[in-house]
Amino acid sequence: MLAPSFQEEVDRYHLAVPEITRGNPEPVKELYSKLDDVTLANPFGGIARGWAQVEARLDQASRQFQDGQMLGFDTITSYTARDTAYLVETEHFRARLDGAAVAEEFALRVTSIFRREEGYWKLVHRHADPAARPQSRRSLTQPAG
């Protein structure tokens, strides 16, 4: 079988990411490298490093969301080299957060880095934050929650 192209991996990624907002982290886990240098920085704070921490953080994130729906991806830019690639996007969702009665729309600014391992593209870093829209200067000085 021919290894997937980077665009094919991005297509898989776009199918997997919304599953987190439906309480299912498994499709995203399948995309990740299992090596100790992987990282995840998500909107719930902190940076997970190494597969064990990243896996736990994905499980935690999936428990925060219910009834998620993907509204779309806006690709800002991407770049592919021989063995590394990155993708910068805005992801748009609707989901219930932390058991809320009503779903809310939200957008995440996301940078994802991939590495080719044994011929296959694997996710090695994902940074997602809610700063998809311009933030006030004051938001920079707010204490971390």
Where is each model-derived feature located?
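A beta-strand edge to alpha-helix "cap/lid" segment located at domain peripheries
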Residues: 1-27, 37-145
